């Protein structure tokens, strides 16, 4: 497109992703302040093809405007960093009233046939403290994570503080949380 510059960054494997990543950034050129709107078509022509598969991800919502998106997107591949990493406990949100996956919650697979998130917790219409006092209802994975964080803290208290298992932390806590989770047909 006229008036646009494309920046390519060839990444290396990282703690978040063992695959080769290529970062593409489209920025306004010259004295423009905005990127031209419309439908963009990207054509990739590799010099050498290893497996022929590629995925595109966009930055999270805070970094783009609400009209930016893929023409045809895949809702089953909506994870963001750091949820793609192997070791962190990744938490999704679900609606406890309907026992359904929250539409705003990321999901998908990462490399090596691993799927994420690891657990789901209530994250829709959660009653919580409001700024300035009182209570309010909020939705989001930020409301689901405290359920899992509190459970992890209780497990660690039982194991480490109470002397029942001095190695009950990290991946062991994650394994116990996953094993103890209630399965549902919804996801």
Predicted stretch roles:
Residues 39-45, 90, 118-120:
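Residues within well-ordered beta-strands of beta-sheet-rich folds
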Residues 31-35, 47-85, 102:
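Acidic, Ser/Thr/Gly/Pro-rich low-complexity segments that form flexible
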Residues 123-186:
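Hydrolase catalytic cores
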Residues 1-53:
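Noncatalytic accessory or regulatory domains flanking protease catalytic cores in secreted, cell-surface
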Residues 48-50, 110, 125:
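Residues that cap or initiate secondary-structure elements
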Residues 1, 67-86, 92-115, 127-139, ...:
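Active-site-adjacent substrate-recognition loops and nearby beta-strands
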Residues 116-117, 150:
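Residue-level detector of alpha-helical segments with a strong bias toward transmembrane helices
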């Amino acid at each position: 497109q006229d008036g646009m510059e494309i920046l390519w960054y060839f990444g290396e494997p990282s703690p978040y992703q063992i695959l080769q990543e290529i970062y593409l950034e489209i920025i306004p050129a010259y004295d423009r302040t905005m990127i031209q709107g419309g439908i963009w078509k990207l054509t990739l022509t590799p010099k050498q093809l290893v497996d022929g598969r590629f995925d595109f991800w966009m930055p999270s919502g805070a970094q783009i405007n609400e009209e930016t998106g893929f023409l045809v997107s895949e809702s089953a591949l909506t994870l963001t960093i750091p949820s793609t990493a192997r070791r962190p406990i990744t938490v999704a949100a679900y609606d406890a009233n309907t026992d359904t996956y929250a539409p705003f919650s990321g999901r998908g697979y990462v490399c090596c046939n691993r799927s994420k998130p690891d657990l789901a917790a209530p994250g829709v219409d959660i009653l919580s403290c409001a700024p300035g006092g009182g209570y309010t209802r909020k939705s989001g994975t930020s409301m689901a994570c405290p359920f899992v964080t509190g459970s992890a803290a209780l497990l660690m208290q039982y194991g480490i503080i109470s002397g029942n298992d001095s190695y009950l932390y990290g991946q062991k806590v994650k394994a116990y949380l996953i094993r103890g989770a209630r399965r549902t047909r919804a996801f």
